[in-house]
Amino acid sequence: SDGRLAHEMLVRAAKTTQTNVKGIDATAGMGEDAFLLAACGYEMMLYEQNPVVAVLLKDALRRAKKHPKLKDITARMQLVEGNSVDELKSRVDDIDLIYLDPMFPGRQKSGLINKKLQLIQKLEPPCSDEVELFEAAIQAKPSKIIVKRPLKSPFLAGKNPTYELKGKAIR
């Protein structure tokens, strides 16, 4: 429901008074975060560079578009297989929001992470150039850049945020 959606940290971070918001998820993974934003009415472009993950996401979106409760949300999600950095650098049309959730380096903690995340971590190496990704996002001149990080990790590209939300495990 919309009430629960409003409590999601990502939704709170993305909140805007604008309508027809266009967003880019530059590090789509399995697309859950972009799905949350699309559920809020955002038009989302998802970039996934790993071909295996992209195929899994493409299949999930294809199936979701046939589901009566999901089709309106997934209609606002467009998947592009490839690296988002080049696209962000050459972007000419306006974009309202860019979401970055690069794969974090493996944790030293032995706590079990869920199976889906384990699979993604096996398929996708940690982001090789976070600075390039962040600089490309800045170059695209969005109204807002949202970065998801583990609580204890350094800020992306060493840049302090202008605004920060903290949860139990992420900020």
Predicted segments with their positions:
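S-adenosyl-L-methionine
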Residues: 1-23, 31, 39, 47-97
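Residues at the starts of beta-strands that form the adenosine-phosphate
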Residues: 22, 43, 76, 143-144
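Basic (Lys/Arg-enriched) interaction patch that binds polyanionic ligands
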Residues: 22-56
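Conserved proline-anchored active-site loop of SAM-dependent methyltransferases
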Residues: 23-36, 95-114
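A short, acidic, amphipathic alpha-helical segment used as a generic capping/interface helix at domain edges
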Residues: 83-87, 125-138
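Mobile active-site "lid"/loop adjacent to the S-adenosyl-L-methionine
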Residues: 102-133
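Conserved Class I SAM-dependent methyltransferase catalytic core
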Residues: 130-171
